[in-house]
Amino acid sequence: NRHYENVRYPDSWEVVKMGEMVRIISGVAYSKSDVTVSGIKVIRGGNIQAGEIIECDDDVYIDNRYADPTNNIYKGDIVLVASTGSQQLIGKTGFATRDYVQTQIGAFLRILRPKDIRCADFLNLFFQSDYYRQYIRSLAKGTNINNVKNSYIEDFVIGLPPLQEQNRIVAITNKIFYMIDEILAGL
């Protein structure tokens, strides 16, 4: 992508396409007649808030015949809003901090499953960045519905530090976010 053409990275960093780092998994399509009071919970766009996957009062459940372990949400997965009418919501992501039992994603979402789970926290930081969101918004524009094509994610080029450096970046960033949360809580 042209935004990275003039970026210089330390020699120890690799320049990789996101498709080398994550596997993209599509969500389940179902009809209203498939909705039940229990079974498999379906995560939808409203469940993705502030970088997290949350429970909602209006969560939907579908019949267990839709069960597919590949489409379950596992710790380290990044859930992406891939189709929506809102430019503000397109591309937003939520990070799975645990396995979600009996839970899959709806058809308008995608799971970005890190190929190396050790990189999950670093990739999550990247997908929370304004840089990523601006990139996605610039590509996903539609007349009514905005869509993130898999190729937008797969072809996106990032700088990837060695694992030890990834962990250091994540630790420092998390510490800063924690301090910000503490300050905001005190206001």
What does each of the following model-derived ranges do?
Residues N1-V28, G159-L187:
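Non-catalytic DNA-recognition/assembly elements of restriction-modification systems
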Residues E5, F108-R110, Y152-F156:
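Short amphipathic alpha-helical segments
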Residues F126-I158:
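Specificity-determining recognition surfaces
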Residues G19-K32, G46-I78:
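Sequence-specific dsDNA recognition surfaces
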Residues S31-S38, S138-A140:
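Short coil/turn segments at secondary-structure boundaries
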Residues K32, Y100, N144-N147:
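Short proline/glycine-enriched turn/loop segments at secondary-structure junctions
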Residues Y9-E20, L112-F126, Y135, D155-Q164:
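Catalytic cores of nucleotide-enabled group-transfer and carboxylate-activating enzymes in metabolic
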Residues R44-G45, A67-Q128, K149:
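A short beta-sheet element
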